[in-house]
């Protein structure tokens, strides 16, 4: 997996911490609080999970369609509710700016008779999101505590409102505005003198087909647009 090096690093850090001092030196009672808030910022890479069409007439024109990871950014507010010694419930409303690159392999017969076509297109979105997830925490070792997350995220793409009004503009790939994703992540908390800092790696997988089926080869060449996003996040909680 492309990002497996980061998971390996987290596991190595967790193993190293398990042999260290177990008495906290900073914020010893921080995780005993029932409720606390914070902020999360991070880097994203997003793409579409595509399914190539079975329509033979379209396949003769578009020989293949591929999506590639493209960079983005997200910022979220964190509300964290302690449910037990090793379990928290988190809500992280925020904004995510993402783009997805798509590549199209046109047949020579089509390109020799048409002049208006694109080999690559970028689809941009601005999501207002409400992720809800469980945080499963391991034992704390000194000022270090690894954890896992699992949950779901509902999002609304504000950029799609403008794009979907331009029904006749073939330069735009239109998307359904609502997306629902399930998420899974791994990270570790570091307890500093005044705040708790965390580094987190998360994957989000879309469950809804985002494609608006227009009468053009850019959307006819696929039968499914589902989102996939990798997130590297930095969290500060007080």
Predicted regions and their residues:
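Predominantly the C-terminal beta-signal and adjacent terminal strand-loop region
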Residues: 177-182, 187-238
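Extracellular/periplasm-exposed beta-strand and loop segments of Gram-negative cell-envelope proteins
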Residues: 47-70, 98-126, 155-179, 209-229
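Short, structured loop/turn "capping" segments at alpha-beta junctions
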Residues: 142-146, 161
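Residues on the lipid-exposed face of transmembrane beta-strands in outer-membrane beta-barrel proteins
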Residues: 39-43, 73-81, 93-95, 128-136, ...
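Mid-chain, structured segments of secreted extracytoplasmic proteins
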Residues: 66-106
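Bacterial Sec-dependent N-terminal signal peptides
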Residues: 1-25, 236-238
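Outer-membrane beta-barrel channels and translocator barrels
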Residues: 32, 84, 139-143, 191-195, ...
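Short glycine/proline- and aromatic-enriched beta-strand/turn motifs that initiate or cap beta-hairpins
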Residues: 20-72, 237
């Amino acid at each position: 997996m492309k990002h497996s090096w980061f998971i390996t690093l987290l596991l190595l850090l967790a193993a190293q911490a398990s042999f260290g001092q177990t008495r906290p030196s900073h914020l010893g009672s921080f995780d005993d609080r029932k409720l606390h808030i914070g902020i999360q910022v991070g880097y994203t890479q997003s793409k579409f999970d595509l399914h190539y069409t079975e329509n033979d007439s379209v396949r003769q024109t578009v020989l293949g369609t591929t999506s590639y990871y493209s960079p983005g950014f997200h910022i979220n507010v964190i509300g964290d509710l302690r449910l037990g010694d090793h379990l928290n419930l988190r809500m992280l409303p925020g904004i995510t700016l993402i783009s997805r690159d798509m590549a199209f392999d046109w047949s020579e017969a089509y390109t020799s008779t048409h002049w208006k076509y694109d080999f690559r297109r970028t689809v941009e979105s601005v999501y207002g999101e409400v992720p809800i997830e469980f945080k499963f925490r391991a034992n704390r070792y000194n000022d270090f505590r690894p954890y896992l997350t699992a949950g779901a995220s509902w999002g609304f793409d504000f950029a799609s409102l403008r794009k979907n009004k331009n029904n006749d503009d073939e330069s735009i790939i239109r998307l359904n505005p609502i997306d629902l994703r399930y998420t899974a992540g791994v990270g570790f908390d570091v307890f500093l003198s005044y705040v708790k800092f965390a580094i987190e790696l998360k994957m989000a997988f879309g469950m809804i087909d985002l494609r608006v089926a227009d009468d053009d080869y850019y959307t006819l060449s696929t039968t499914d647009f589902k989102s996939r996003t990798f997130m590297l996040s930095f969290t500060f909680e007080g």
